[in-house]
Amino acid sequence: MKKVFLAVLVVLFVAAQSVAACTIFAVGKNATVDGSTMTSHTCDSNSDDVRIWLIPSMEAGTERDVVVSGRKGADYSQFPAVKDYGTNGIVLDSYINEKATNQYVHAMYSFINDKGLAMGESTCVYDWSAEKSKPVREWMSKSEGIWDCYMLQDAALENAATAKEAVDFMGAKITEQGWNGWPECIVVADGTDVWVFEAYGGHMWCAFKLPDDAFFFCANRCRIDFWEENSDTYLSAPNMKEFALETGLWNGEGEFRPCQVFAAGNYSFNCIGREWRVLVTLESDYTADVIGKDELAYCETPDDTFPLYFTPYEKITVGTIARICSDNYEGTKYDGTKSAYAGMHGNVLSVPYEYRPTNVPQCTYFQISNVKAWLPEEARCLVWFGWGAPSTTYLTPVFASQTELAPHFGVGTRYEYDPNSGWWNEALVQTAATLNYADAIEVIKSVRDPLMEAQYEATFAIQNQAAKMIKNGQRDEAIKLLTTYANYQAEMWFDLYGDLSEELLARYVVGRVNMKSSPALHKDWWKEVVSAVSALDK
C-alpha cells in the first residue's frame, strides 16, 4: 500500500511544477523579539539542487577554484577532496586561501557559516523590453565577469566572519574581476549588523547597512534607491556615478538611484505585489498608506511609494517571517484561495496561479537565520531550514558548526523519487495537501505548529547549554551536543512527515474527507465560478 501511495503522490507533484523566483527578508537586532539578526530566503525554482552539505574548513595555502555555473549535477559531498562541479561548471580562475577558511552550509545558494555569518539572495530582473532599459541592455551585453552569485556567496562564507567583511570581500571581487549573471540583492547578517548588497553587472555594486530597528524586503527587483559617498554605512564600486554618466545609464539629472540606473523598470505584480503585502501584513508607519489599497500591488512607482525598509511596531520572531513567507494574499482581492485555479478547496499550491504570492509550490527550500551575537560562534550559527512550500513545510534547526548533517540532507534529485531524500519527504506532504488544501493545511498546522513552538524554546535552551560548556573549555563536547540535537530534530521531522503524507492521502481518497462529503472552501463564490463557466459552455 505504501508504494501505491507514494507513486500517486510522485506523479501529482512532478506535474505541478512551474517557474518562479526568490523572496528575501532581513531584520535588525533591535527589531526582533530575541535580539538576534534575521535573514530569510525562499529558494523558488523548478530546477535548483535540493541537496544540502557541510563544507569543512580548508587549510591556509589551499588552492580555491573560481567556478561559474557550478551547481547543476554537481556533488559537493566530499568537497574539497573531490571537486565535482557538475555538467555546467567552468573553472575561470583560482586563488590561494591566505588563511584557514570557515565551515559553512552549502546549498543552491549557500547561507550560513560557523562564525554566524548568514545570507539570502533574490535574483533581480528589470524591464528588458523598455526603451529606457536599452542602455542597460547594451552595457550588460558587453560586461563579462567571473563571479556568479553561487560562487560569490560560497567564497564570502569561506572567508568572512562578519557582515561588513562579507560586503568588503564581495565588493572587491566584483570590482577586480567582474560580475557574471543577472543583478542580485543579497542580505547579509552576523548577529550584530545587517547589510544589503546589490550586484548589478560588470564591476558595479553597492551596499548599505540596515538600521538596527529595521525590516528590509526584496522580491526579485533591485531596491537600493539612494546614494551616499562611501562611509561606515554605505559602500559602492569606485567611480560608480562617473561610470553611469560615461555610459549613458544616467543623465546626471535628479537623484542618483542605483536600482533605477542599473536595473530599472521591473514593476510587475509578481514583484510589487509581494512587497505591498509585507507592508500590509506588518504594522508600521507605512501600513495605513497601503492597507486596503489593493491597486498598489500594481504600483509603477514603488521606489517612491514604498519605503526601502521600515520599523515594525511589533518585534519580529522566526514565526513572523514563516507566516509572511506562507502568505497567499488571503483577505485581499488577490486571495489565492479564491482563484479559479485553486478549485473548490482553495488549493493555493496549484499551478498556474493567478497572482504570484510569496508561498509557491516550487520552493526548493526555505531558510531563516536566527543569529544571537552574545553566544559563542559555535552556538550562534543557527538557521531554521525546511524543504518545499513555506505553508506546508516544517523548520528544523541547523548549526553551521555541526560535525555532520542528518543523512537525508545530502541525497536526492527532484527528477527521480528517492524515499531517503529530505526534499521528497516534504514534497509528498505538499502534494497530498493539494487534494483538499483547505482541510489539509489545518491538519498540517495542528501537527506541526505545537512542535515548532516547543522546538524554538528547546533550541534556545540547547544553545545556552552549549555556551556554558564552551565557556568551561568543553568546545568539542558542545559541538557534539548541538550536532546530536539538530540531527535528532531533523530525523524527527523526517519520520513525522513520512507518516503525514500517507495519512493525508488516505484522508482524501476518492475526493472525500475520511469518506465524508467535503464542501467548497468559499461555497457561494465557488458556485458563482461554476455557474459562470457553465454559462460559457452554453
Feature annotation, model-predicted:
Residues 1-4:
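Positively charged n-region of N-terminal signal peptides that target proteins for export
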Residues 7-16:
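Bacterial N-terminal signal peptides
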Residues 339-471:
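Substrate-recognition/cap regions that form aromatic- and gly/pro-loop-enriched pockets
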Residues 22-149, 169-308:
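A contiguous strand-loop segment
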Residues 245-374, 378-382:
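Glycine-rich, aromatic-lined ligand/substrate-binding cores of catalytic
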Residues 448-538:
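Histidine-centered catalytic/metal-binding microenvironments
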Residues 153-159:
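Short, well-ordered beta-strand elements within core beta-sheets of diverse protein domains
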Residues 159-167:
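Short, charged, surface-exposed loops that flank catalytic or proteolytic processing sites
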